[in-house]
Structures are given as structure tokens and as C-alpha cells.
Amino acid sequence: MAFTGNFFCTSFKDELLEGVHDFRLTSGDVFKLALYTNSASFTAATTAYTATNEVTASGSYSAGGGTLTNVSPTVSGTTAFTDFADLTFTTATITARGALIYNTTPAHTYTNPTCVVLDFGSDRSSTAGDFTIVFPTADASNAIIRIA
């Protein structure tokens, strides 16, 4: 079974209420993005990072993925949101169908809890070049993580 859509992981919603994730730019947690092949099977029930079906290390992409740069959480109207800076893996030969965003330093006993499942809709590839994850605009309508 392949990716089936974009999801906030159900466990992530619970962990927000437990105070597990800190998205602040300074002194916040460390979040990573790992890339996966079309053989990966993730849904909203996904709870933690796994190396199963992760793309092979290439160029600047290594096992576990890349570290994300947080964009400080903010509020617009009644919507709170946060986002990440775009992430580029250089000189990489990669074919990925989707990604997981997960927390490597949670304020709890969880191990690498997942936050978001991203489905690219189809395979995306680079050959000895840049593989870039472009995050949406950090605003109340578009940010990757929004709570309305």
C-alpha cells in the first residue's frame, strides 16, 4: 500500500495536548524530515519515524532525513500556525513519494514521534542534483501546521 494522503498524525494531536512538541525557533525541539519510497505505507495512525522504505542515502541526504529549521509559531485571527524553512538535499539521486516530519527531541519519553505525513501525489526525483522540499507560505491559510 502506498501513501494515501496528507495527515496530521492522530498521536501528534494527543501529544500537542501533552506538551510534547516545542516548535519555537530558539530553544525549541529538533524536527526532521525523512523521505520515503512508494512502498511506504503511512496513514494518520503512524506514530513514529521508521527506516523501513526510507529512500537510500545519497548526496547530502542521510538516513533519518534532514533537520528542519522551525519558523516560530504565531497567530492570525483565531488560527495558530507554524512552518519550516525549505529543505534542500544537494547532489542527491532520490526518488521519493512522500515524507514524514518527526520530532527527535520531544519533551517526553516518546521516541521520534511523527507529526505529519506528506504525500507528494506521485514520485518526485532528482539525479545527482538538488531535491528540495518547498514548504507553503507561513500564514493562517497555508502553513504546514495550522490549528483553527
Predicted regions and their residues:
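Small cysteine-rich, disulfide-bonded extracellular modules of the LU/uPAR three-finger superfamily
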Residues: 1-97, 104-148
